[in-house]
Regions:
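N-terminal accessory interaction module
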Residues: 7-81
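N-terminal pre-Walker A segment at the start of P-loop NTPase domains
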Residues: 77-110
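Walker A/P-loop nucleotide-binding motif
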Residues: 109-129
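AAA+/P-loop NTPase substrate/partner-engagement loops
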Residues: 137-172, 180-185
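Loop/turn-to-beta-strand initiation segments
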Residues: 170-174, 220-229
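Conserved catalytic/switch belt of AAA+ P-loop NTPases
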Residues: 184-224, 233
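A short helix-turn-beta junction within AAA+ P-loop NTPase domains corresponding to the substrate/partner-engaging
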Residues: 242-263
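Conserved AAA+ ATPase small/helical "lid" subdomain
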Residues: 268-269, 274-338
Length: 339
């Protein structure tokens, strides 16, 4: 935002920006100016800071315009304040999950060597990744391919070394789901840094004698050609610990970082409604009225729930199947904080 006196804003007189495939007229809107008019391969544009206004990408964007006369410099007006509509929030989050699927495909193919997926618990991060990998594994199993593996919980450095060795080939993927402790262990982090190095040849070494390696037939060095996905509830930008932040920065520099942009309770609730509308509860064979009642229960009681998540919706749906006449009372005692 433009609180500093030296920051220039620009008021768009005539200009458009493509949002989800549609040219949106931005006439009258005020943005922080990044770079004045230029002509590119697709015509003229002025570059502004899209992150300053809700509903626009969190980066610099190019607004299409015919000439410098299509906008005016404005040091007096404030940046336009917009609040995202529910539809815009759902579209934004849906776009991120579509990107997550595309990036997971690229990881599986070995085109992308590593990805970090960041988002709050219970919004479908793991499901989005595993759904894609399961589809590829069904095809690869016909040709004798090796399945990917999801690693959860704590892991020692030597355990990590052995796991990487077992999934070292190009078409293999290791998914580290909620394994944040591995980021804090210096030796484990150094192993990951070697595995995800940007060099064409990535060689990992274990430089101390180990009975475990000898016993499992694992060499003390090997070339790693596989890929890795890290699924975490951490938002790397919010980490306060300097030590952990430096560790995460070292990992982030070697990975693509996918932030699912679910930051608020409203974002999370709209994500839950979107996934439910897409058919998440169909397997429970509940009629539409009961499904709507389940969602109303979640929405009304969202501040009292033990966890506002897709998992909680599924728990309540299970109760609606098991106890058709008293599922709400059961849910009040199992998924809500007791007073």
């Amino acid at each position: 935002m433009n609180e500093g006196s030296n920051m220039k804003n620009v008021k768009i007189l005539e200009g458009t920006y493509k949002i989800r495939g549609k040219d949106v007229d931005l006439s009258g809107m005020v943005f922080p100016l990044v770079q004045e008019f230029k002509v590119g391969a697709k015509g003229g544009y002025v570059t502004v800071d899209g992150a300053a206004i809700a509903g626009f990408p969190d980066r610099n964007i190019k607004i299409a315009c015919d000439s410098p006369r299509s906008y005016e410099l404005d040091t007096k007006s404030n940046v336009t304040q917009l609040e995202e509509t529910d539809e815009q929030i759902v579209d934004r989050i849906r776009d991120r999950f579509d990107m997550l699927k595309d990036m997971t495909k690229a990881v599986k193919k070995g085109v992308v060597s590593a990805m970090i997926v960041s988002g709050p618990p219970g919004v479908g991060k793991s499901h989005g990744v595993e759904e894609v990998l399961d589809r590829y594994d069904t095809l690869s199993s016909l040709g004798g391919g090796t399945k990917y593996e999801v690693v959860k919980g704590a892991m020692s450095p030597i355990g990590l070394y052995c796991k990487l060795f077992n999934f070292k080939e190009k078409d293999q993927v290791l998914v580290f789901d909620d394994c944040d402790a591995v980021f804090e262990e210096p030796l484990a982090l150094n192993i990951l840094k070697a595995a995800l190095d940007s060099k064409k040849k990535r060689t990992i070494h274990w430089n101390t004698d180990s009975f475990k390696l000898r016993n499992e037939g694992v060499p003390d060095s090997f070339e790693f050609k596989g890929s890795a996905i890290f699924i975490t509830n951490l938002d790397f930008r919010d980490i306060k610990s300097k030590k952990l932040r430096s560790h995460l920065e070292a990992l982030e520099s070697r990975c693509h970082y996918m932030d699912l942009t679910i930051k608020s309770e409203k974002d999370k609730m709209l994500r839950i409604k979107q996934v439910t509308a897409d058919g998440m509860l169909d397997a429970y064979k509940l009629d539409d009225e009961v499904k709507a009642d389940v969602m109303d229960f979640i929405d009304i009681n969202k501040k009292q729930l033990r966890e506002l998540s897709l998992r909680t919706v599924l728990k309540v749906a299970e109760l609606a199947v098991a106890f058709p006449d008293r599922w709400e009372a059961m849910a009040e005692n199992t998924v809500m904080h007791t007073r």
